[in-house]
């Protein structure tokens, strides 16, 4: 690989030295073309956007399909006409009798009574309380069953840490928020605290209830264990740009919980034939409520090959990021988190040894994201993220006079949405639908534009095909689990993709096909085993490409099937 320029642009407050005619020619070369025109050379913003898409992890398989846990009935039968409840104070008894109605007036086995006890516990849980139910020794031949309900009341909180790296006192304050001695366990608060503690990198927390010192109370004892100090992954794929190298290798390393307070230091490296990317990040809990702060920095350097090699086109992009995140809802069935992030980008491009363009962008992004697990009809899972972005783009004053991209100079705003739903159709079949899109209120910098092509979009087209300010992609996949032997899983799927793009929100000049769509269909295979994931997919274009030239794609490749592969190995238990 050729050495990449570390500082291709060094603005010194001067006007650029090229004559006016040369500037006009360069401006025409880098302007976004109308559909059917040759593609311009990619710039730092496009390369940055492509790198961020390549770094995004593929969506995981959905949670396992729901199965019934009730064992088959066995042993003697008896008929129950009435349930006598003892120890019930937090709920009206009528609520529990209504929940037990399916078990009255019919022959039951002992296993059926155990299912009835679970229904009582579920009723408490649905109202936000923790309880246990059991059957005291009794004679049930008369048709009356006595159920003893032990309503959980908090006694005290203990920690078993045994000289661990994790700070037990900090974790105890996180789990114990909202718990008061002698009062009933508020199940949502208890569940939230335990889940937040287990969200901390490099920390495992298990809560056990034990009989308390005071009658009717239960003590919560936390078993705190350390996870591995180091984690990470390596990956190889072909989702790079044709001009910087399709093959890319990615390495990630994390240092988990080095301080004992649930922090994480991360580093990411990506290498392509003509691309180098490096990033670092740090996250830290701010108190025990779940609030987290994050800092990040990335640096990217590129050089264009293929037909742009003679231009000696190269550039760099640097990104600073700071954010605050807070879990609005944390539970085993649904989660919602909010994040506010500030981002600053500096993007530089050069050609033929001359500084070409310098752009600076700053924005604030408010993100809401979450997921939910659904019951019924085999079960399902939904995950979503919504971003609302407001920012400002600045170009060097000398460039504004000639650059058609100057239309992106100034303030911008946009909204992004990603929605994914998985639904089990049977023990081995599930359907996945994914909608991804954005809407801008004006023209955007290339680093912020939406793209249809690539393995995360319309999979029958190459990376960076059909970029624009606003757009959307819908992916539909039908999956079949072919085998789950040992600890591995083989998953085959058919897919169909369709996307629409608006190249410029506020077009200038002649753009006959500012709006158009692309479609593709294909098949794929995924293999998971012990942290190793292999993805292979083939996408075939369906219909024509209004944005292409003479039947080819915008990057000059012929229209035909696209083969995508990605191999990833995680180094964490």
Task: Label each residue range with its predicted role.
Residues 214, 239-241, 272-274, 298-302, ...:
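Structural signature of outer-membrane beta-barrel domains
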Residues 230-240, 251-255, 261-272, 280, ...:
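Transmembrane beta-strand segments that form the barrel wall of outer-membrane beta-barrel proteins
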Residues 200, 215, 242-246, 271-277, ...:
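Transmembrane beta-barrel outer-membrane domains
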Residues 292-446, 551:
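Transmembrane beta-strand segments of outer-membrane beta-barrel domains in Gram-negative
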Residues 205, 230-232, 259-265, 288-293, ...:
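Repeated loop/turn-to-beta-strand initiation elements of outer-membrane beta-barrel proteins
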Residues 37-240, 252, 268-277, 415, ...:
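Periplasmic polypeptide-binding modules associated with outer-membrane biogenesis and secretion
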Residues 403-573:
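C-terminal transmembrane beta-barrel domains of outer membrane proteins
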